[in-house]
Amino acid sequence: MLRLAVATQQETFERIRDPLAVRDIEVVPVRASERTLSLSSPDLPSVDAGLVFPSRLMEGGAVSAALDVPWVNDREAILTSRNKAEVLAALSTAGVPTPETTLVSNPVDDDSVAAAAETLQTRTDTAELVIKPNSTTRGTGVARVADPDSLLGVTDYLDLVHDFRATGDRSFLLQEYLPDARDYRAMIVDGEYAGAVKRRLPEAETAAGKWKHNVHRGAVAEGVALSEAARELAERTADVLGIDYLGVDLLETDDRLVVNETNARPTVDDATKYEPGFYDRLAALIRKTAESR
């Protein structure tokens, strides 16, 4: 039986364990962070491949070196997808539609930020913008602003957080806000569409003024059948980025369909929300990865 190291969220581990077991793949948990690890004689399981490179790059690097196996999504794939600006620039250059976005390489002065926001608002003919840290996940630190004072207030907070945590990435994005956009997460496995969910907020949450569609922020993920255009867009995104196993976030309005973000560490949802052959294709990709060793 092939043994697969999994260092992703607990919910993904629980969901993929049994379906992969019946396909002769044993899912083995590997913890890369919040632990002690002897580098001289690391206490790690014997595995044939890994699913996705651990989220903490330093600890992940040590664990990956000790395991000495290929990953379905390696460090390069994780770094590429985590850099939202790089993803959007690559997709835009390849002709893949994305929201109008400006990268702010912090620190910059208030006048420069305000000028960039005004230019973006003029180009998109919209008053509201979304501001987000370039490397954020799960909607952390993402805000919606409609006036200069609110915008600069958010950047003030970003400056404080950056200084306190001495983070390596201080950049952030200014992005057009697409009101009433439908939010989808498409799953790509080995370059092909494998299913999708629509993420929506309960009506009570929307009525209360919430707008973020992240599941970890209270949104509900429902299995949907995407249009052919949306499927092709998600597949094209994975092809441009060169990432075999990818979550592609799509926003759709009445007249636009764009790629908003990607996730090379996607949470696996219930099997009923994916195409019937999802686990067969995932197992085949894992085996192909192990054979590349």
What are these regions (language model features)?
Residues 3, 7-107:
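Conserved N-proximal alpha/beta basic substrate-recognition cap immediately N-terminal to
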Residues 55-57, 134-136, 265:
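Short glycine-rich anion-binding loops that position phosphate/pyrophosphate groups of nucleotides
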Residues 80-172:
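Active-site nucleotide/adenylate-binding loops and adjacent lid/helix of ATP-dependent enzymes
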Residues 129, 194-195, 258-261:
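Protein kinase-like catalytic core scaffold
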Residues 140, 145-232, 237:
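Phosphate-binding site of ATP-dependent enzymes
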Residues 186-188, 256-270:
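A short beta-strand motif that forms the metal-chelation/ATP-contact edge
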Residues 208-256, 281, 285-293:
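A long amphipathic alpha-helix within ATP-dependent nucleotide-binding catalytic cores
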Residues 269-278:
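ATP-dependent carboxylate-activation loops
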